[in-house]
Every structure is written in C-alpha cells, then in structure tokens.
C-alpha cells in the first residue's frame, strides 16, 4: 500500500508482494496482529523453515529459526528488538515493519492495519545483493507466495 512504510523500498526491489486479509483482531495493535498471524503458522511452514535452515547451513547462510517468536505475546517490543526471525524497524499502532539483512539480501516485511476496512496487509520487499542471494530466491520466491496466504488464512 502507498501509505505503508515499506512502499519507499519498492524502487529497485528484486521481489515484492502484498497480501490482504480480514483483520481478525480489529482492536489490536499491529504488533499484536503480527504475533497472532505468526503464532498460528501452519505446521508445514515450520517444517519448510526447518528444511530451509538445514540446507542453507551447508552453503554458509544463517539459520533463521522459525517465524514465531520464542517470547510470548505479552512482551513489550521496541525498535531494534528481534521478533522471531526479524529485527523490528518501525512500530506504531497501525504498522509494524521488520527486516532481516545480510550481505546476500535484505528482506523487509510489514503488517499494516487498514482499520476503516477492517483488513490487514502483509507486504514483503526483497533487495538481492549478489549471485548467492539470487540463487537463494529461486526456490524461496514461489514458496513465499504459498506461505504468506496460508498464514493469513489461519489468523
């Protein structure tokens, strides 16, 4: 969405998408909505992350763990904190923006609450830096297009 914090990162992006869903928690903050979405990550997504981590460890990429944060949802988050596999970059009542960056690629994820429409939008923007990042995105991009809608369908 135009008013999302990640919109400015679209220029030059190698991958981007956005998925909209009904807001199951219309009174909640963006962070609480994000925690609810990742808290109900389907088991097959967890298994896919485990497989991803096992494979990429062999080629020198980092093990991200799973999407769901280890801490409970009652924790007060601040910019700079880790939230699951991401670092928190922006936090407001209506939007949470997180990133994971390394020398191969930068990933930006946003959950934006469209309160008037009672919707949430999860957006992803990826900037690839080198050949290993491009190689990594070959299988990840199509799987990502399955994972986010599946997570939103369970929230």
Predicted regions and their residues:
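Long, compositionally biased interface segments
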Residues: 145-155
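Hydrophobic ligand-binding cavity/cleft-lining segments
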Residues: 1-68
């Amino acid at each position: 969405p135009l008013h999302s914090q990640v919109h400015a990162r679209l220029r030059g992006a190698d991958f981007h998408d956005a998925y909209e869903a009904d807001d199951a928690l219309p009174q909640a903050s963006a962070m609480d909505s994000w925690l609810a979405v990742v808290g109900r990550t389907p088991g097959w997504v967890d298994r896919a992350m485990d497989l991803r981590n096992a494979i990429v460890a062999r080629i020198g990429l980092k093990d991200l763990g799973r999407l769901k944060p280890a801490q409970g949802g009652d924790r007060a988050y601040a910019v700079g904190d880790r939230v699951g596999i991401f670092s928190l970059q922006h936090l407001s009542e209506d939007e949470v923006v997180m990133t994971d960056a390394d020398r191969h690629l930068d990933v930006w994820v946003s959950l934006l609450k469209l309160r008037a429409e009672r919707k949430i939008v999860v957006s992803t923007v990826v900037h690839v830096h080198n050949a290993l990042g491009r190689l990594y995105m070959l299988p990840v991009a199509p799987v990502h297009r399955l994972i986010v809608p599946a997570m939103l369908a369970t929230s």
